[in-house]
Design a protein with these regions (language model features):
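C-terminal motif of bacterial Sec signal peptides marking the signal peptidase cleavage site
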Residues: 16-19
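Flexible, low-complexity junctional segments that flank or bridge functional domains
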Residues: 21-248, 252-254, 334-339, 390, ...
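Solvent-exposed loop/turn segments at secondary-structure junctions
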Residues: 187-191, 230-236, 252-253, 260-262, ...
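Gly/Ser/Thr-rich loop/hinge elements
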Residues: 233-289, 295, 328, 336, ...
Length: 408
């Protein structure tokens, strides 16, 4: 797939220059830097973010001011015999609260916990904190609620074919809704599942084949619904399965730029982010509707945006989560993205963040903001619990009654 080839080229270019930076890498590598105190931990985490964060040229956070304010506070903590984990958590939460990378997660284990601390590890998610302040915020709805709504449609004979499975890899629901090929994924795991033969992968493949046959091979097709509500993201190569079958020429979504190098503003050039058509494809002359909500993040947002670029595509639902930066990180090569030990064994920190910035075709970077729908339909918990999915119903109505919205 073209985006993947671009990423590989970018990495090769950076590798060629690593040999002249080995000494700096040893000094500044936050994957191996030792420490014993809260101040030393703060220095490693602050510098790791300072060197590896991808959004400094558009992020409003004054990171130098953060250092000036918090270094004395961490010095004070380091002089104490023990440190309450709650205090440490409050410091890191405030430090990172204004960072716009909505993939970001900062995991910290207290190096000097108090004896009565029952919890010594915490996670800071700036994106989650921001999203929860939005007036339309709601929790992710369960598959069981969605299945109740689908069963209600089945009772009226609108749904005649369905396949569903919930596996450790994620869940998938495919069905025929009155001639509409419908697909719901909890995450993008098709690249993995369709290339393996274990029982979970086979169940996912069976459900996907139902959707594919309906969308690509069915004689009568009224529309396609790609439901990404609550989808947390996943493999970017899943474009090969959810969008490439419906295009006959390359589709450019925008450009990506990688953070590479120790300086804050060391970036790669902007490179086109393009989806290639599948070898077997069908360009439908019917509406393709992307369903997405506030809990749609990362790859699900890019898929939703890609649908809006199609002449017969639209987005129904809510403004999305706002985590658009791809993650293909190797900090020791690019000096960007995720660093630390996920298991908190080699280091007492783990910082997960994007190392690329995605810029849509219109040039408006929406990291931390999310994509807006062509047709807004807010989640209605009361109706959903009663088996009435107002967002899905709106998508069906657009397709069956020719109510295609214009771009916002």
């Amino acid at each position: 797939m073209k985006p993947l080839h671009i990423i590989i080229v970018s990495i090769v270019v950076v590798v060629a220059g690593v040999s002249c930076r080995n000494h700096a890498n040893e000094l500044l590598n936050p994957n191996t830097a030792p420490y014993n105190t809260p101040l030393e931990q703060f220095e490693v985490v602050w510098n790791g973010i300072n060197n590896g964060y991808a959004f400094w040229d558009i992020d409003p956070t004054d990171w130098d001011s953060v250092y000036t304010v918090y270094k004395p506070r961490f010095e004070e903590l380091s002089n104490q015999t023990s440190v309450p984990t709650a205090t440490l958590q409050n410091y890191y939460a405030d430090m990172c609260s204004r960072l716009i990378d909505h993939h970001m997660a900062v995991v910290i284990r207290n190096p000097k916990p108090a004896a009565d601390d029952t919890i010594t590890t915490f996670v800071i998610n700036p994106g989650n904190s921001e999203v929860r302040t939005r007036p339309y915020y709601h929790e992710r709805f369960s598959d069981s609620l969605l299945l109740v709504c689908i069963d209600k449609l089945r009772s009226t004979a609108l749904v005649d074919t369905m396949a569903y499975c919930n596996t450790p890899q994620g869940s998938i629901l495919a069905c025929n809704i009155n001639g509409i090929a419908y697909l719901h994924l909890s995450k993008f795991m098709l690249t993995e599942a369709l290339n393996n033969n274990d029982s979970s992968s086979q169940a996912i493949a069976k459900a996907y084949r139902l959707f594919y046959d309906l969308a690509v091979h069915a004689d009568t097709l009224k529309g396609i619904i790609l439901d990404q509500r609550g989808n947390v993201g996943g493999y970017v190569n899943d474009f090969d399965y959810v969008l490439a079958p419906f295009i006959d020429k390359p589709l450019t979504l925008g450009t990506t730029r990688r953070k590479e190098g120790l300086a804050r503003y060391d970036y790669s050039v902007w490179i086109p982010f393009t989806i290639e058509p599948a070898a077997e494809h069908r360009v439908p002359d019917v509406p393709i509707v992307a369903l997405a909500d506030i809990n749609s993040a990362s790859m699900s947002e890019l898929t939703t945006y890609a649908v809006t670029l199609l002449p017969n595509g639209c987005f129904v639902g809510e403004r999305t989560y706002g985590a658009h930066g791809p993650l293909f990180s190797n900090f020791e090569i690019n000096y960007s993205g995720t660093f630390g030990d996920k298991n908190l064994q080699k280091t007492l920190h783990y910082v997960y963040m994007s190392n690329d910035v995605f810029k849509p075709n219109d040039g408006n970077i929406l990291e931390g903001k999310g994509f807006r729908p062509n047709h807004q339909v807010l989640f209605n918990s009361e109706k959903m619990n009663a088996g009435d999915d107002v967002q899905l119903n709106a998508a069906i109505d657009i397709i069956l009654n020719n109510k295609f919205p214009t771009n916002p």
